[in-house]
Amino acid sequence: MAAQSSMAQTKGKKPKSFSPKMLVYENLQNDNVLRHFKQRFAQLDTLIKNPIWVKAPVIELGLNKQHHADINKTDSLFWSKTAHEHLALNRHNGLEVTGQVYARPDAYFDSDEDDAKEVSKYKMKVQAELGWNIINSKFYQGKEKRTKIALANELDRLQIKKRQTADIYEKTADELTEQYNFYIGTVIAHKLDNLDIMNEAYQYMLEKDRISNDKMLKVMNDKLEAEYDISILCSDRDITNKPIYRIKPTRVVVDTTALWEHVDKESLDARIVMTKLEIANNESKLNNYLSTTRLTPFARWSTYWQSNDKFSHNGDVGIRFTVPIYNENPRKRKALETQKEIIMNSRSTDVKEIRQSVNILLKKIENLNQAIATEAYHIQQTGKYIDMRRFAYKNQKKGYNYLMRMEEYTGLLESMERMYKLMLNRGLAIINIEKAVSIYNNNNIFNEIEL
């Protein structure tokens, strides 16, 4: 009943992916320790001879379905907004109707009977006028006015798009780290199995006074560090009884010409700056002296209710104009030229900072390329060394140092661990470059070549 109760309590619980093993052993037997070594050597020989070769995890930098949906919806809304605003401008033909009605109270109280004066006086006046405000219409600078609408919406669209794509870099870095962590974690798990057996052996030797505390403490510390790393890297993944995964070493070649061209012309930041400059140039065209005047041809019809209770009518045509006695437009254009210089200087500063940070990352990638190649060569040579030593150990009639042999296998695993971490750091450096220069989809700037 107790066993059934215990099973019922544990049923349905998710098993832990990793549990620390025993650190301190008691009552160790020499035969048991040697048997553990031999079993582990046989297991390692099989794993090393038959690894699972995998390609280096790919940096899947790109927009997911939700990104595409959000961007497409935003683009569609801005295009619709621009179209409606252009239609509104096209309706602005400059025609305007004005009218006025007013009375003259003095006409009711004046007793003068002069007929001539009676004709010139009126009690009320009604006036209607059709004018054509041509300068403030689509017919004057219509192209520039439509461009102003389009550029303002394009600037807003690009700025929103930049915010919509800002999260893909962290997401991509997390996904890449997760992939590498699995491979790194499995290597550390195999190293930990070696350290467990070495720890067991050192404690047996300590009991027999054959070793100092220093070596045992080092192995115990290495074991604790490995357990900590696994708990961080693979806390929610099962890495027990996994094969040895061999990631094919690669070298990353960066097309710096295409990279800097993207920074200068194709990135979202560059397009935003170019749009701001186009807005300033277009605004400079709109700012001229004529645009501050009003020139309105008109036709007017007037009806008078005269003091003698008769009605008279008359029509006239003319041109009404308003001309300012000052001209502020040269100063406005000068201000716009200054604004363009501010935009260019700001962009120049941004590009300078981007180039500095990117050059540091490019140097880091090159250094990591060299370190990865060195580790790959070291792994290759260590593997050959282990193969040669395997036959030597088998033919050793007087026995051999089991701990030394285990350290050789552990050294190979540690070299794999270092190389995988170097490749991860290189991938993260690439993502940081892509973030700095606003690359948000897969491109041909970074090419990965197998060594």
Task: Briefly describe each language-model feature range.
Residues 6-22, 26-68, 236, 251-260, ...:
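Acidic, low-complexity, intrinsically disordered peripheral segments
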Residues 24-27, 47-98, 213, 238-299, ...:
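Amphipathic alpha-helical coiled-coil scaffold segments and their short linker/junction regions
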Residues 37, 145, 149-231, 370-441:
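Charged, solvent-exposed structural "stalk/scaffold" segments
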Residues 46, 68-148, 161-165, 169, ...:
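A glycine-/polar-enriched beta->alpha junction
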Residues 100-108, 131-133, 198, 300-304, ...:
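Outer-membrane beta-barrel pore domains and translocons
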Residues 342-381, 388, 392:
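C-terminal structural cap/anchor segments
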